[in-house]
């Protein structure tokens, strides 16, 4: 079992907790999944902190469970499946990094919610691709990756269509980019400097 101090060493104090009440809040949801309490909850705020957390967990063979939406949860996918798993709460990673009206693209962190993005888009006369009855505190990325059904199929090819590209941290801590985010350029910022919008050419 990994210690609280080991995670604090990579992301700092105040963002790792073993408080029994907090752990209990992640142990069950509104599904039929059997409850299981995590060992710790860590709350990174940057990509580099996520990488550090994943690398540490990989080295120690600790299982991680990402959570990006606020409660309540319903599918059982935020409940640990094994003993001593660690919750990675991504709700503090809630920056809207970029909105491009011309290409209808928003670049968001995993903790950005429908309520948060919709308020920003309305200022520019746009709206998000909204699934059926989303909670205001539901993570946009979480909803799209869970393939929640859309109410406007006219504007989407399939349930994964809204994700034009992504930046992922895989199990060993390596960062990879998908879709239009693969390049050219080493970073999303490099792409934007030359007019890139992180979309594949055929994306509508």
Residue ranges and their predicted role:
Residues 3, 53, 117-120:
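Hydrophobic side chains in well-ordered alpha-helices
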Residues 6-28:
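Conserved oxyanion/phosphate-binding beta-strand-loop segments in alpha/beta enzyme cores
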Residues 7, 57, 173:
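Residue-level signal for inorganic ion chemistry
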Residues 14-16, 39-41, 61-65, 84-87, ...:
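Structural motif
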Residues 23, 28-93:
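Glycine-rich N-terminal segment of FAD-binding domains in flavoprotein oxidoreductases
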Residues 41-49, 54, 105-112, 132-133, ...:
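Catalytic cores of large soluble enzymes that bind and process phosphate-bearing ligands
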Residues 95-97, 110, 115, 119-204:
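FAD-binding subdomain of flavoenzyme oxidoreductases
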Residues 97-103:
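Acidic/polar active-site rim loop that often engages polyanionic ligands
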């Amino acid at each position: 079992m990994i210690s609280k101090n080991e995670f604090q060493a990579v992301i700092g104090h105040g963002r790792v907790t073993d408080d029994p009440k907090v752990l209990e809040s992640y142990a069950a949801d509104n599904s039929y999944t059997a409850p299981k309490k995590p060992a710790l909850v860590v709350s990174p705020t940057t990509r580099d902190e996520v990488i550090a957390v994943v690398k540490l967990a990989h080295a120690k063979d600790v299982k991680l469970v990402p959570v990006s939406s606020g409660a309540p949860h319903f599918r059982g996918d935020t409940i640990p499946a094994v003993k001593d798993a660690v919750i990675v709460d991504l709700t503090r990673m809630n920056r809207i990094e970029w909105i491009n009206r011309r290409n209808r693209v928003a670049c968001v962190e995993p903790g950005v919610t429908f309520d948060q993005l919709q308020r920003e888009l309305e200022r520019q006369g746009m709206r998000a691709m909204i699934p059926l009855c989303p909670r205001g505190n539901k993570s946009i990325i979480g909803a799209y990756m869970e393939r929640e059904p859309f109410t406007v199929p006219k504007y989407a090819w399939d349930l994964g269509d809204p994700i034009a590209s992504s930046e992922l941290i895989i199990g060993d801590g390596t960062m990879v980019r998908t879709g239009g985010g693969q390049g050219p350029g080493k970073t999303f910022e490099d792409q934007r400097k030359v007019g890139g919008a992180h979309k594949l050419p055929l994306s509508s």
